[in-house]
Curated annotation (Swiss-Prot):
Name of the gene encoding the protein in the UniProt record: rps4
The protein's name: Small ribosomal subunit protein uS4c
PROSITE patterns, per the entry: RIBOSOMAL_S4 (PS00632), S4 (PS50889)
Residue span, S4 RNA-binding domain: 94-155
Lineage summary: Eukaryota, Viridiplantae, Chlorophyta, core chlorophytes, Trebouxiophyceae
Species of origin: Helicosporidium sp. subsp. Simulium jonesii
Coarse class of the protein's main subcellular location: plastid
NCBIfam families the UniProt entry points to: PRK05327.1
């Protein structure tokens, strides 16, 4: 079993906006029911189980995880010292595909996974092809010198705006 490869807009309509999953947005007209379908009834308030299930599904689809992978990350987060939720976020954000996505080279987590599995990413000058590889802060991420990666890096250089960086750090302080 691999990651989800089905229709993405169907998931977006069900779970809401998932920026890590895809950049696609559903059309406003697609919210209507097709002809011949009965009118929707009033939705009931979701149960606690339903809310937790939605949160789990949003997390799984956002980071491209399967249920057992998320379960293992939750176990690790609970066993570590400190707040389990912060530990879980730290574990998910320390994955290699998440680091590549946050660097701004690619637009979605799936594109980051593809870049890694095709062998374009080096960690401490070693080719890593596993998207779930856990990175430390001290490790150096690099890209193979190919036409694809050089085009991606040029695109980032053109879209870089230092004013946004200054605003970000001014708000954080």
């Amino acid at each position: 079993m691999g990651r989800y490869r089905g229709p993405r807009l169907r998931i977006i309509r069900r779970l809401g906006d998932l920026p890590l999953f895809t950049k696609k947005k559903p059309h406003i007209a697609s919210k209507r029911l097709p002809l011949g379908h009965p009118v929707r009834k009033i939705k009931r308030r979701p149960s606690i189980y339903g809310l937790r299930l939605l949160a789990k599904q949003r997390c799984c689809y956002s980071y491209g995880l399967r249920d057992y992978q998320l379960k293992n990350y939750i176990k690790k987060a609970r066993n570590a010292q400190g707040d389990p939720i912060k530990n879980l976020i730290f574990l998910l954000e320390s994955r290699l595909d998440s680091k590549i996505y946050r660097s701004g080279i690619v637009s979605t987590m799936a594109a980051a996974r593809q870049l890694i599995t095709h062998g374009h990413v080096l960690v401490d000058n070693i080719k890593i092809t596993i998207p779930s590889y856990s990175c430390n802060e001290s490790q150096i991420l690099d890209y193979k010198n190919t036409k694809l990666t050089s085009e991606l890096i040029e695109k980032i250089k053109l879209s870089f705006n230092p004013i946004y960086v200054l605003e970000y750090y001014a708000i954080k302080l």
